[in-house]
């Protein structure tokens, strides 16, 4: 299903081919959560990404956008070296800035996975410097039911093919 040329919708029920030997985490995520997964092409321009978000917000009556960064590139200042995928993260953050929703959140999962040369405390300090931006810091506990669910789902999404998920 592709209701707009700027994004795709993945619903595991619509995929009939055997995908066992293919890296397709969106399929597994859709299957495990029982929901549609929206994919915006990583080769898209900022305007195409913004159009995709605007269309999804309107089409699904979205009131909150929650971006999730695997790692912490979205928290960096640009002065760091050996970055992972900061361009992709920054493009999505910029595109979402202009979207009219009541709440916008970004979460960094696996904060020290790709930014290990910069201490986590330094990143948190930077966020505290900017008023009203840091909502919460949370260290995951494997006994927490939601953390267990995360591990369960992402293990099925073939985390060995994702640097961040394999390190979390």
What would you call each of these model-derived segments?
Residues 1-37:
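Glycine-rich nucleotide/cofactor/substrate-binding loop typically near the N-terminus or early
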Residues 18, 22, 26, 46-49, ...:
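Generic structural signal for well-ordered, non-membrane alpha-helical segments
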Residues 33, 37, 57-60, 96-100, ...:
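Structural signal for hydrophobic packing residues in well-ordered secondary-structure cores
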Residues 33-96:
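Internal, conserved structured core segments that host functional sites
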Residues 82-83, 121-125:
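Short, solvent-exposed amphipathic alpha-helical segments in soluble enzyme
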Residues 94-111:
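Short, flexible loop segments at boundaries between secondary-structure elements
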Residues 106-108, 112-123:
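Glycine-rich, charge-decorated loop segments at or immediately adjacent to ligand/cofactor-binding or catalytic sites
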Residues 123-168:
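A conserved mid-domain beta-alpha-beta active-site/ligand-binding segment of alpha/beta enzyme cores
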């Amino acid at each position: 299903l592709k209701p707009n040329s700027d994004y795709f919708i993945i619903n595991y029920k619509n995929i009939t081919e055997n995908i066992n030997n293919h890296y397709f985490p969106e399929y597994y995520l859709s299957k495990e959560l029982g929901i549609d997964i929206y994919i915006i092409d990583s080769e898209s321009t900022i305007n195409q990404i913004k159009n995709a978000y605007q269309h999804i917000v309107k089409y699904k009556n979205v009131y909150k956008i929650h971006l999730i960064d695997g790692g912490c590139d979205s928290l960096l200042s640009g002065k760091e070296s050996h970055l992972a995928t900061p361009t992709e993260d920054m493009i999505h953050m910029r595109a979402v800035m202009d979207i009219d929703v009541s709440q916008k959140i970004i979460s960094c999962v696996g904060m020290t996975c790709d930014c290990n040369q910069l201490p986590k405390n330094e990143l948190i300090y930077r966020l505290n410097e900017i008023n009203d931006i840091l909502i919460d810091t949370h260290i995951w506990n494997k006994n927490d039911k939601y953390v267990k669910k995360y591990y369960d789902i992402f293990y099925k999404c073939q985390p060995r093919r994702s640097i961040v998920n394999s390190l979390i």
